[in-house]
Swiss-Prot record:
Organism superkingdom: Bacteria
Function in brief: Forms part of the ribosomal stalk which helps the ribosome interact with GTP-bound translation factors. Is thus essential for accurate translation.
Keywords: Ribonucleoprotein, Ribosomal protein
UniProt source species: Serratia proteamaculans (strain 568)
NCBIfam families named in the record: L12
Family recorded in the similarity comment: Belongs to the bacterial ribosomal protein bL12 family.
Subunit structure: Homodimer. Part of the ribosomal stalk of the 50S ribosomal subunit. Forms a multimeric L10(L12)X complex, where L10 forms an elongated spine to which 2 to 4 L12 dimers bind in a sequential fashion. Binds GTP-bound translation factors.
One Pfam family from the record: Ribosomal_L12
PANTHER family documented for this protein: 39S RIBOSOMAL PROTEIN L12, LARGE RIBOSOMAL SUBUNIT PROTEIN BL12M
GO cellular component: cytosolic large ribosomal subunit
Entry's Gene Ontology molecular function annotations: mRNA binding; structural constituent of ribosome
The protein, known as: Large ribosomal subunit protein bL12
KW Ribosomal protein (keyword) present: yes
UniProt cross-references to InterPro entries, sorted A to Z: Ribosomal_bL12, Ribosomal_bL12_C, Ribosomal_bL12_C/ClpS-like, Ribosomal_bL12_oligo, Ribosomal_bL12_oligo_N_sf
Length: 121
């Protein structure tokens, strides 16, 4: 006569916590497995992306119209002429960090209209 699943469940339910721990250890040894929890992979990464509220705007390249890009950078960052020029010439460089998505998209649009290559991270 074979044991049914229901009988196994009833038998485990009747065990004490220490007996269950010993049973798990014996099963791990018998079947060569571990009862450790499996880490969540892609689902956890997807949740992290959804929760992102701060973005960085990175100047990747200046394009053909360097003067217009410098003006756009000055207007967006409040830097002086020399600082804005140095920042533009050091591309790729972070222009603003930790800003909202709307602000990041507006800044990206303004810089792209000036001829710059921009990335929002």
């Amino acid at each position: 006569m074979s044991i049914t699943k229901d009988q196994i469940i009833e038998g485990v339910a009747a065990l004490s916590v220490m007996e269950i721990v010993e049973l798990i250890a014996a099963m791990e040894e018998k079947f060569g497995v571990s009862a450790a929890a499996v880490a969540a992979g892609p689902a956890a990464a997807a949740e992290a992306v959804e929760e992102k509220t701060e973005f960085d705007v990175v100047l990747k390249g200046i394009g053909a119209n360097k003067v217009a890009v410098i003006k756009a950078v000055r207007g967006a960052t409040g830097l002086g002429l020399k600082e804005a020029k140095d920042l533009v010439e050091s591309a790729p460089a972070a222009l603003k960090e930790g800003i909202s998505k709307d602000d990041a998209e507006a800044l990206k649009k303004a810089l792209e209209e000036a001829g710059a290559e921009v990335e929002v991270k």
